[in-house]
Amino acid sequence: MTGTFTRRGFIGLSAAAVAAGLAACTGGGTAPAPAGQGGTSAPASNDLRWFDYESAQSLELLKEQIAKFDAQAGTTTTVDSLPGSGAAVYPDKLRTELLGGKGPDVWRIWGGQIGAPFVTAKQAMDLAPYYQKFGWDSRINTVAIEGMTFEGVKAGVPFTARAMGAWYNKSLFEKAGITNDPASYAELEEANDKLLSAGITPCATGGKYGWHIMRLYEYLLETSAGPELHDKLLKGEESWDRPEVVTAFTNFKKWQDQKWIPDGALGLDPSDIEPSYVQGKTAYTITGQWAEAEHIQAAKKDPADFGVFQLPTGHTPQRHSGFVEGYMINARSGNPDKSAELIDFILQPETQKALKIGSSTVAGAEPDPQSSPLSYQWSQGPGKQPFYTIQDQAFPKKVADQYFAIQSDLLQGKITPEEAAKQMQDAVSAWAKN
């Protein structure tokens, strides 16, 4: 790692490296508060606006913590959220607001190719002075910081490094006669068949917006291509028009045809279908550590009735999908100092724990084995394994949108797996040339 994010960087990041980066966090620092940067600022104001994509359950926790900050800082913060839309809609909504001059003071965003355009357009402030003032370099996972650093500019502050696993309902697995976590892709297919025979839809996923059902395809690609080739595909260094990609698309269609995913999955909203494993309507979903708070605890269920395992790929290293999320400050904010203070408040260990961040980048906010046993279990096992960058963060928005359209066309039977592979190569190669 070099401290500079490029479109070819942050691929195949080791979760163990993230853990090492967090272990290196030790203390704080002080420096003069910086002024706003990047164009004409709005008039100074104690009215702040925060833009997010939290779910309804997590949004209430966030609002509670921001209200505490407002009471201390004398600010009034409006919190807006666009839940469930993911990278397919949220960045465009944010970009439209910023171009219209009415963007938020603080916004949440993914790293990689989703966050990068806001830095290139100088809409996001260079936060280096605030890193110095608040000592973020020594309090926040240093490897995760690289995921929010763009061409040397620390334009974001990471608060979480997420990882995708299979979160499942133990009682439904038991009903289907599944006694052990699948240890190979073949065993996962066998588990799907057992669940289906027991009258249970195996995997909860939704294709609205494209990004949720993408989690299934990227897993299938990791399985068919292996780590080295998968990384090269994501960076445009190898052709997608190849047998391994065709195999992944073939298996992707198979999951639909075998009814291992819900009927009409393409039209389902992720925020509606993902928690269905907690409700007993599906057996498992592909999601991250936030599921413990947002799905299980929010439904007042016992975490002991659920489990999580790493989707088996048959490769060494055994990897899963992962990504970084953080906060940016509007370069035209009327009060960048208060905006930075608000972010710093959110990044306090006690605030992170109150927000139930199961994969926090903040030293001292690691998962509690008592209150978040599943997140802790993940952090001590699969969480120490390497991960590859989630595909809608590895690609710029235009390519991701093309990718989602190809997924959709394949599942609708409009194109074959071979045609899907060729179309992916066309989309990725056009980007890689630039």
Residue map of PLM features:
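Conserved N-terminal structural module of periplasmic/extracytoplasmic solute-binding proteins
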Residues: 2-116, 136, 180, 300, ...
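Extracytoplasmic/periplasmic substrate-binding proteins
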Residues: 53, 64-65, 250-335
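A structural signal for short loop-to-beta-strand junctions that line the ligand-binding cleft
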Residues: 97, 104-105, 134-172, 201-204, ...
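Short, solvent-exposed loop/beta-turn-alpha elements that line the ligand-binding surface or hinge
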Residues: 128-140, 203, 207, 224-247, ...
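Extracytoplasmic/periplasmic solute-binding protein
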Residues: 150-159, 164, 189-238, 282
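Glycine-centered hinge/linker elements that transmit conformational signals in sensory
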Residues: 192-194, 234-265
